[in-house]
Amino acid sequence: MTNIRKSHPLIKIINHSFIDLPAPSNISAWWNFGSLLGVCLTLQILTGLFLAMHYTSDTMTAFSSVTHICRDVNYGWIIRYLHANGASMFFICLYMHVGRGMYYGSYTFSETWNIGIMLLFTVMATAFMGYVLPWGQMSFWGATVITNLLSAIPYIGTELVEWIWGGFSVDKATLTRFFGFHFILPFIISALAGVHLLFLHETGSNNPSGITSDSDKIPFHPYYTIKDILGLLVLVLTLMLLVLFSPDLLGDPDNYIPANPLNTPPHIKPEWYFLFAYAILRSIPNKLGGVLALVLSILVLAIIPILHTSKQRGMMFRPLSQCLFWLLVADLLTLTWIGGQPVEHPFITIGQLASILYFSTLLILMPISGIIENRLLKW
């Protein structure tokens, strides 16, 4: 009798994706983040569903409904904070996952990489819209400032902003449509993640050495299922420490003040995971230039495969490129810090220098280091 796992049309797909999948024998813990992102997405969809049962997307009651969830709903507080801090964990895993792709040259799988960039944009859009829903001060002003950036687009900018707002300012129509989009986008993300996996399994996983591993494969289960559980335990422990001991550590105190269109907060800033892009936006004095730099700060990932000049795939045996990679990481941390600071001296200058360094490292220094390392191979 044939094993049902290998014969059943539906279970067969799961079997080929998670059980009998041939995986390289030497992939490290950096390959954990894909499965952790799947766990984060599932957690966000489930907690979000329970929150949506009690939330009302109306400007008069949105803030009160979130308060009601925390005070009156059974375990509502833990659901709300799991959702809010789960988003932070999602982005930590996401940035680690992208960083691993850049370090080990996984961007050479162009379809998988491009779908990944689409996923990154979609997750960022979803997180932004979710931040608007509690209708606190930072929700309202964050929505106003970020949507207003579209007015920098020539000719159609102003009409586009008013079309998105559903009026002449961020109001009830905006909140309702943002809730609708925030609810549907995670399911689109799930579908895109399926396509991402489909393309990945066409080629097989990359590995730290960057060379083909066709001759040395092991089954995904039990080896990597067990290995992924370790990463999962670390993720759950970190998340629960955040949720149970300091749930507001990564949030903004201004969001505990109900939205007031007549009172602007002293420092309008997005959630911490967008601060690097926000710093790049603010570092350019021109509005359209800032918006373009903001979009390009993420879109630059799409041209990394074109700029790959090295004969080696990953950075495992390329010390010069490794130095530049960690310089880029330090630069992104600097930008994140700058994004949370007020717009004054010396933060403006530091932000501008960090922004220049970010783009020049990715577009100029890394391709040059690849060429230099190719020359060094001949010595």
From Swiss-Prot:
**What keywords appear on the UniProt entry?**
Electron transport, Heme, Iron, Membrane, Metal-binding, Mitochondrion, Mitochondrion inner membrane, Respiratory chain, Transmembrane, Transmembrane helix, Transport, Ubiquinone
Gene Ontology molecular-function annotations = metal ion binding; ubiquinol-cytochrome-c reductase activity
Membrane topology category: Multi-pass membrane protein
**Binding annotation for a ubiquinone:** 201
Q: What does this protein do?
A: Component of the ubiquinol-cytochrome c reductase complex (complex III or cytochrome b-c1 complex) that is part of the mitochondrial respiratory chain. The b-c1 complex mediates electron transfer from ubiquinol to cytochrome c. Contributes to the generation of a proton gradient across the mitochondrial membrane that is then used for ATP synthesis.
The record's listing under Gene3D superfamilies reads: Cytochrome Bc1 Complex, Chain C
Q: Which domain of life is it from?
A: Eukaryota
Q: What is this protein called?
A: Cytochrome b
Q: Where in the cell is it found?
A: Mitochondrion inner membrane
Cofactor stoichiometry and binding remark: Binds 2 heme b groups non-covalently.
Additional record remark? Heme 1 (or BL or b562) is low-potential and absorbs at about 562 nm, and heme 2 (or BH or b566) is high-potential and absorbs at about 566 nm.
